[in-house]
Amino acid sequence: MVLRSGICGLSPHRIFPSLLVVVALVGLLPVLRSHGLQLSPTASTIRSSEPPRERSIGDVTTAPPEVTPESRPVNHSVTDHGMKPRKAFPVLGIDYTHVRTPFEISLWILLACLMKIGFHVIPTISSIVPESCLLIVVGLLVGGLIKGVGETPPFLQSDVFFLFLLPPIILDAGYFLPLRQFTENLGTILIFAVVGTLWNAFFLGGLMYAVCLVGGEQINNIGLLDNLLFGSIISAVDPVAVLAVFEEIHINELLHILVFGESLLNDAVTVVLYHLFEEFANYEHVGIVDIFLGFLSFFVVALGGVLVGVVYGVIAAFTSRFTSHIRVIEPLFVFLYSYMAYLSAELFHLSGIMALIASGVVMRPYVEANISHKSHTTIKYFLKMWSSVSETLIFIFLGVSTVAGSHHWNWTFVISTLLFCLIARVLGVLGLTWFINKFRIVKLTPKDQFIIAYGGLRGAIAFSLGYLLDKKHFPMCDLFLTAIITVIFFTVFVQGMTIRPLVDLLAVKKKQETKRSINEEIHTQFLDHLLTGIEDICGHYGHHHWKDKLNRFNKKYVKKCLIAGERSKEPQLIAFYHKMEMKQAIELVESGGMGKIPSAVSTVSMQNIHPKSLPSERILPALSKDKEEEIRKILRNNLQKTRQRLRSYNRHTLVADPYEEAWNQMLLRRQKARQLEQKINNYLTVPAHKLDSPTMSRARIGSDPLAYEPKEDLPVITIDPASPQSPESVDLVNEELKGKVLGLSRDPAKVAEEDEDDDGGIMMRSKETSSPGTDDVFTPAPSDSPSSQRIQRCLSDPGPHPEPGEGEPFFPKGQ
């Protein structure tokens, strides 16, 4: 009841974050009495400089202290006769110095995690204010509290930031980088990252040098190289800040990859410019050779970092081939090789960020094909957790370091820096987008340009680079650091808090949270192959052509070396299908929909009953050459012959439409069949004279109807109405009987004469030639009997039109 009603009328949702903050601050009490994260001397130094201390219970791994007569414990319960006094056995001891550093680090991480939980418990705050802003505020409060009790707050050391906090964030971004969107927009990203960063650095440095000349006595002594160095530090977009803000607003994939890709790839430009101007500041005179070497160092730093990352990525992929028997250590290789790539690049002053991105992109497809799904899940969640904790610590220590650092405020310099940063960003984006849209198919709209310009956030990288400046060579480094912190706070707080309402106000397209299906993958690969073929036909080799070449090389050579077993020969579509099936199975398990699947106990029992045997590969029987040739011959003779296909496109060898050609062939076959059927019918009927068309027959009958009028009654042909065109429906028996009945009513002599004629059969007479200009007309002979005349008339005129007195015309079957 107390939990439901709350305490003093307050809901538990409001009490819980407050309790988290109180617990975190109470846990930081030992830190308030210490010197923050400043590493203390080693244990051996502490023990040698301090007086001998009491050995605690937990101190079991260190060597025992030297025992001296003065340090031996005294036992007051023993008499002085023959025995020395000693102290009582210590039951409990406190030794904070021994666990100081790991204890404080754990407390800071615990504070960061509790703050993240507290922010997401209160949805009203997290929906308005970005998480990075809240973490900076927490850092400011903790730093002010530490300073308020008279202690020195911990400061974010540059080595700690670059060697321990930044690599997890970059590795997480590089390993799970959306490679398709990144490669399709690589040209645009490189222009923004290289040309845009150079423009911001030189534009801001030149204008700040002009401000220093007219700004007053405090900033008159800042030279051109110092301002250019300051411009190179403050001009780069920070990937940590961009990730923290853009992940919350769920912007569409195009804008996200453009801004985030720029923040990743501008590291090479920032590193080169920083070291270049730092070295030039110590020179009395800078020549053309120095400028050329500085320009050359950009390619060395960028390409060298990529090369280092590729080498370590290939080594990691090759190592994962042999981890099938030791699945536990599979995720460790990914972390170690990636971190070694970063450290190796930093060792030679190359771009460590480029090395991390290259190693993650190269190793991922081959490592995922070799490792188990559990290892893949471990890598995914560990990287997400590690990067999230590092990002939280960076923003907290950014606030703490703001309180702890020494600052030098100058209104003219700070306000001019903030104003010129915004102007340089807007002008750079507008100018570069105008040039880029000339070559892009999908143009960047004014809304997209506004989001790209507004999303240029600065963060802890600029702060750490500013902190690295040596005060001996750069006396105004405190002023630089103050201006950098001001720009960071403005971009994170003002731009970070207002970018979400602006995205909603401008109705910018957001990211669609849809699951990728196998149908989408099939259509994507189909379109890729189609565009590759179109590029080959047109003779224009774009990125689809080179992507297809790279995929063929990867499938033919690289996969065989870096992927173990039969997975190297598995098509990409089948691999994607297996991946989708595994993902759906995991989602089914997590959702609790496993009612119909056997439990773990039944599965284990079935495995015990039926022991697992090694999978045996199906071996097809080998065919002899004679048998194979016989099969080919049978197929060639019985299968339909396929049409010949042209191997290449040529305007002189265009083929007809296959559908039109097939239709024409079908019409020709039908016409030939009709002609053959007509020939067969004509052969069977054997007409006595030339056949007339129905039109000529009607005209002839109409001109002389008496010549064709029957002089006696004709026999009636009975036709089955169910099948009027069937010759089987004619009743020849009834027809003969009807003829005999009709003959009884006439003269017996005539009937006998007709019977004799009928017995004589039908005589085929040759037709006399008619005179020119007259038609061939059938004229019955006077000596012919009526039945003979009827049969001859039917044979000579098989037309469809009936004679007078007849019923429906008779059509033979098939006509």
Curated annotation (Swiss-Prot):
MF term (GO), any: phosphatidylinositol-4,5-bisphosphate binding
Region (Interaction with TESC): 503-545, 633-815
Effect of residue 164 to C: Almost complete loss of activity
Residue numbers marked as site, Not glycosylated: 370
UniProt cross-references to InterPro entries, sorted A to Z: Cation/H_exchanger_CPA1, Cation/H_exchanger_TM, NaH_exchanger, NHE-1-like, NHE_CaM-bd
Positions in the Cytoplasmic compartment: 122-130, 177-186, 250-252, 323-328, 372-373, 439-444, 506-815
Reported impact of residue 526 to Q: Reduces interaction with CHP1 and the exchange activity
Impact noted for substituting residue 226 to N: Does not affect membrane localization. Decreases sodium:proton antiporter activity. Reduces Vmax and Km for Na(+) and a slightly reduced Vmax and Km for Li(+). Decreases sodium:proton antiporter activity. Reduces Vmax for Na(+) and Li(+)
Positions of region (Interaction with CHP2): 515-545
Effect in UniProt of substituting residue 238 to A: Does not affect sodium:proton antiporter activity
Linked pathology: Lichtenstein-Knorr syndrome: An autosomal recessive neurologic disorder characterized by progressive cerebellar ataxia and severe progressive sensorineural hearing loss.
Name of the protein in question: Sodium/hydrogen exchanger 1
Organism the protein comes from: Homo sapiens
